């Protein structure tokens, strides 16, 4: 029997996100989220979850001027709501479209939300936009197209050593990531961001595909920005 809502011209509900995957099957080193996302993008491409060139994937660095980034539903939290105040965090967003419907996914190996999680749910539950207004805790998002990120990002992990050269957090067991041009460390270029970096939506939707460091957007325009990207 036909659904009267659809037959009458009403818009059917969007399809649900794909069933959750086992996050433990992906490489994850605590406190090295930038490297986790680098390897995650590669694995999503290799496994066919993304398109072969990774053109529907985006690495997203979350930080602000004060390096105080509130997020919820984080596994590292000791509170019931999963609250953590990071200096920065990195996630992967996959742009998906079906019949004009925006069905974006968020891949966050450090989140207790479904893996992957629908973009709408992640924004609502983990980011909670407008929670802090114009305070120092408002989040900024540096969005880098995955093909550019995989070529350009590098980290020698020096940010995880104290002044005596001791590890603050143990590093991954694999070799550090070196950019295609031989750069060995540019992490700070990705996590440093300010409101002055935020430009108009139209130009950012174009620049994200060519800029080595992507584009910086604020939390109020985050959903609209991704709605403008192709799937």
Curated annotation (Swiss-Prot):
Gene Ontology MF, one: protein-N-terminal glutamine amidohydrolase activity
Gene Ontology biological process: defense response to bacterium; positive regulation of camalexin biosynthetic process
UniProt-annotated stretches for the region Disordered: 1-21
Catalytic residues, chain numbering: 33, 89, 108
Superkingdom of the source species: Eukaryota
Keyword Hydrolase: yes
Described purpose of this protein according to its UniProt entry: Mediates the side-chain deamidation of N-terminal glutamine residues to glutamate, an important step in N-end rule pathway of protein degradation. Conversion of the resulting N-terminal glutamine to glutamate renders the protein susceptible to arginylation, polyubiquitination and degradation as specified by the N-end rule. Does not act on substrates with internal or C-terminal glutamine and does not act on non-glutamine residues in any position.
Entry-linked PANTHER family: PROTEIN N-TERMINAL GLUTAMINE AMIDOHYDROLASE
Protein's recorded name: Protein N-terminal glutamine amidohydrolase
Organism: Oryza sativa subsp. japonica (Rice)
């Amino acid at each position: 029997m036909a659904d009267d809502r659809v037959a009458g011209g009403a818009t059917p509900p969007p399809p649900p996100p794909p069933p959750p995957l086992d996050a433990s099957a992906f490489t994850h080193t605590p406190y090295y989220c930038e490297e986790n996302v680098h390897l995650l993008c590669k694995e999503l491409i290799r496994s066919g979850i993304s398109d072969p060139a990774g053109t529907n994937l985006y690495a997203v660095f979350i930080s602000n001027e004060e390096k105080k980034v509130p997020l919820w539903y984080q596994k590292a939290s000791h509170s019931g709501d999963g609250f953590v105040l990071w200096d920065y965090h990195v996630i992967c967003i996959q742009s998906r479209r079906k019949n004009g419907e925006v069905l974006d996914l968020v891949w966050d190996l450090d989140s207790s939300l479904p893996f992957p999680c629908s973009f709408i749910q992640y924004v609502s539950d983990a980011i909670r936009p407008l929670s802090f207004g114009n305070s120092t805790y408002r989040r900024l998002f540096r969005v880098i197209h995955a093909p550019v990120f995989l070529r350009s990002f590098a980290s020698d992990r020096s940010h995880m050593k104290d002044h005596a050269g001791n590890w603050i957090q143990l590093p991954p067991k694999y070799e550090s990531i070196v950019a295609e041009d031989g750069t060995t460390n540019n992490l700070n270029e990705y996590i440093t961001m300010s409101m002055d970096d935020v430009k108009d939506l139209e130009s950012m939707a174009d620049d994200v595909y060519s800029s080595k460091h992507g584009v910086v957007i604020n939390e109020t325009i985050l959903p609209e920005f991704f709605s403008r990207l192709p799937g």
